[in-house]
Amino acid sequence: MKGWNVIVIGGGHAGLEAAWAAAKFSRVALLVGNPATVGRMPCNPAVGGPGKSQLVFEVQALGGLMGRLADDTAIHTRMLNASKGPAVQSLRVQNERDAYAERAQDVIFGHSEIEIVRGEAADLEQDGQGGWVVVTSDGRRLHARSVVLAAGTFMRGVTWYGRQSRPEGRQGEPPSRFLSAPLERGGHVLKRYKTGTPPRVRADSVRFADLLEIPADPQPRGFTGTPGPRAAESPTWQTHTTPQTHALIQENLHESPMYAGDIEGLGPRYCPSIEDKVVKFAHHDRHLLFVEPDGVQTSEVYLQGFSSSLPPRLQDELVRTLPGFEQAVIQRYAYAVEYDVVDSTELTLNLESKKLPGLFTAGQLNGTSGYEEAAAQGLVAGTAAARRSLGLDEQVIGRETSYLGVLLDDLVFKGSDEPYRMMTSRVEHRLLVRQDNADERMTPIGHALGLVDDAELIRVQEKYARVQSGIKSLSKQRMQGQTADAWLRRPELSLADVETLGATLPAELGASEREAVEIRVKYAGYIARAESQLRSEAKARELSLSGVNFAGITALSNEAREKLTRLQPQTVEQASRISGVRHADISALLVHLKGQRVGS
């Protein structure tokens, strides 16, 4: 009887990170239906963006894969929100779609501690000794101490093209027919969610001269550092819907399975279909769309923002109402997919089932959307599964430490009634958990977890020692009656501007270190206030709410007032864990408690 410490089911972004992380501890089996699909980007050919790049930087700092794969296959990089503060600046990397999957397969298939097992998981059984048996559809029984289930959109998956449906997990791939049953048998309540993907259009049928070109940033950036020169680059482009697009959709809503009532699953609020945009935002006369190449020498482009479940013949008409797409030929049609998800409040903060110990879940199965959210969960689940299999202590990544901590905390304590997407607005202390300091924050955590080796920890520590040296150097240099750091704190001046005034930094500082110096000096006051607020909130969360009349606190949102009155939490910490109670509501509670103390 062959066994492993961990079996990972599914080779998407969550499964990749889970297998990679678990393999740092012991031998792992990666069970996939078709190894050729491992690491595929089934939706947009890009990584990062607001709220998402921060997760990728954190995964990278924890020893994960996604940032490295994205950098290795990048064809276009842009820093989004570059004109805003560092708390919301977010890297977005456009990737060569096929190359990304090929690179992922090279890394995973070449790993000495990861065994690729081909087959379909048909059942999950507890072995009576704290371990698990994965039963395949051809009758094999695979034994492991822990299992990570990362089934994506495949569990009882159904794709929709207009009113026609097919049993698929995604286009052309069969669903997971059996895995929902053992979860339900074990007491899990499953929900149905829905997502969608846009059409892919033949690149040679698009008039790119009629589109707005979006060039890459002049200086390429990456998740793993400053990348070297690329073999090839490509711009992206922008177009938009027209009144003709909107009219055609309105006239044919009866052919949408969502509006006809065929689809039961809840769709993503922050990534709506083009039908939803036209119906829910009818006051807009156009919606921006982004045209993204699948690669430099690609034969097709991806129409970001145009996901749809309308029938193919209508998609042909709709796409040709867009500027630059009048002669467009669709190579692969858009579709919606409906699938099972677990209730994430039935998981621990390490994504282990509270009902089925030793079973971990990650990715879209947990009700999230997006590659980045999936990768982050996969790393957590794979690490926790491996540590459990070896009898090691649990380690929890706290909400205050990272975007990853917020993601876990939201899933477990708040849950979601729709596909969850990470955004900067979900993070209370985002000035402290920026993408630029992810390595400083997360590398020590990765080292403590066993994911990062001593050499990497020392490298990061030495990097930030150089950063501190640079900051100290600026504080000692005077120009025109002021220190260099005082000049740098002026909002209109950059570090380069201050250097033209005569300031110098140690020559050994690299680009990322210079950026860290600039951010820490320029935003020193804001950062200090945020740190003070975080310390105050940590103390405040221990405050008692016993006897508080929540119904009488008018500053609370209606939802928070109703839930607090019904659930009667005894501490601020407990109140903050209730779904629908937001950071603003907690602040209102703290103001109320302070007023009570003053009044008494």
From Swiss-Prot:
InterPro entries: FAD/NAD-bd_sf (IPR036188), GIDA_C_N (IPR049312), MnmG (IPR004416), MnmG-rel (IPR002218), MnmG-rel_CS (IPR020595), MnmG_C (IPR026904), MnmG_C_subdom (IPR047001), MnmG_C_subdom_sf (IPR044920). NAD(+) binds at residues 267-281. It comes from the Bacteria. Its cofactor is FAD. PROSITE patterns: GIDA_1, GIDA_2. GO terms for cellular component: cytosol. Keywords: Cytoplasm, FAD, Flavoprotein, NAD, tRNA processing. It is found in: Cytoplasm. GO terms for molecular function: flavin adenine dinucleotide binding. Its main location: cytoplasm. GO terms for biological process: tRNA methylation; tRNA wobble uridine modification. FAD binds at G10, G11, G12, H13, A14, G15. Residues 216-239 are annotated as: Disordered. Homodimer. Heterotetramer of two MnmE and two MnmG subunits. Belongs to the MnmG family. HAMAP family: MnmG_GidA. NAD-binding protein involved in the addition of a carboxymethylaminomethyl (cmnm) group at the wobble position (U34) of certain tRNAs, forming tRNA-cmnm(5)s(2)U34. This is tRNA uridine 5-carboxymethylaminomethyl modification enzyme MnmG. It comes from Deinococcus radiodurans (strain ATCC 13939 / DSM 20539 / JCM 16871 / CCUG 27074 / LMG 4051 / NBRC 15346 / NCIMB 9279 / VKM B-1422 / R1). The lineage of its organism: Bacteria, Thermotogati, Deinococcota, Deinococci, Deinococcales.
